[in-house]
Amino acid sequence: MPKKKTGPRKKAENRREREKQLRASRSTVDLAKHPCNASMECDKCQRRQKNRAFCYFCNSVQKLPICAQCGKTKCMMKSSDCVIKHAGVYSTGLAMVGAICDFCEAWVCHGRKCLSTHACACPLTDAECVECERGVWDHGGRIFSCSFCHNFLCEDDQFEHQASCQVLEAETFKCVSCNRLGQHSCLRCKACFCDEHTRSKVFKQEKGKQPPCPKCGHETQETKDLSMSTRSLKFGRQTGGEEGDGASGYDAYWKNLSSDEYADTGYHDDEEEDEAEDEEEEEDGKDSDAESSDLFTSLNLGRTYASGYAHYEEQEN
């Protein structure tokens, strides 16, 4: 029989469980609500952007910097572990800051805990948009996380990416390793796996969570809970239209190709006919101009300036 747990042992186990849950809840904080990714409006140019030490657009320093770790704008003397001791009861502005994070480009206050823990726990350490491959230093907007594949996204690509994220890189919902129906889907690899092939020796399944992807280790989701769609690639004989009985094959494919070729030759024939008509119209126009000039040459208008006659010649005669 197992040993009976004593009071101190129960308290220690409960404390360890609470600490574990606290660490897990801290790691699952919404990225949009994190202080280093908070929304900030510049005091000088009035442009909204991600919380950062210097404005992305005008490089000006904010009057009230926000700490990237604890999110405070005022450092109190009594209730904080200040590395830099300040004389007053509290400090704000540049007197409160202690460092700039290299990952999120935001101020960190001069508290000992924030300075020692933020660089290791910064959620924007590898924050590079999966679509445009821009980091925090390459654009001024905030960083978001895809709700399906949990990759980083910038403000410009977040809606477009999430609208097309649930698309498999296959034409069926079958498992990539066998021919059975894939009950679990990895939204990073865009592939489905059956129950047997989700068991991996490399990535272990945690208690109370979905099995990890055998390729990348990301947590899979059940396909029935997602609005997954397959990618349709039409090439070769698949581009041919279906026949009356619903079948399509190479006959329809070659018929379409031949009809396209005939359509192209007909198009070129029409162009040649139009050019010939234009040339005929130009020739007809030249003939009509010559005929009209012949008619006017037979007319006698007498002595005019156009015929080389001037009025002073008549006076001399």
Curated annotation (Swiss-Prot):
Intracellular or extracellular location(s): Nucleus; Nucleus, Nucleolus; Chromosome, Centromere
One protein family per Pfam: NOA36
Motif Nuclear localization signal per record, residues: 3-11
Region (Disordered): 1-24, 206-299
InterPro entries assigned to the protein according to its UniProt record, in alphabetical order: NOA36 (IPR010531)
Keywords of this entry: Centromere, Chromosome, Metal-binding, Nucleus, Phosphoprotein, Repeat, Zinc, Zinc-finger
A molecular function GO annotation: zinc ion binding
Chief place where the protein resides: nucleus
GO cellular component, one term: chromosome, centromeric region
Basic and acidic residues: bias regions: 10-22, 216-225
Sites bearing Phosphoserine, chain numbering: 288
Biased composition (Acidic residues): 269-292
Domain of life of the organism encoding this protein: Eukaryota
Zinc finger (C4-type): 42-58, 67-104, 129-149, 175-189
Annotated family: Belongs to the NOA36 family.
The protein's name: Zinc finger protein 330
Species for this entry: Cricetulus griseus (Chinese hamster)
Lineage: Eukaryota, Metazoa, Chordata, Craniata, Vertebrata
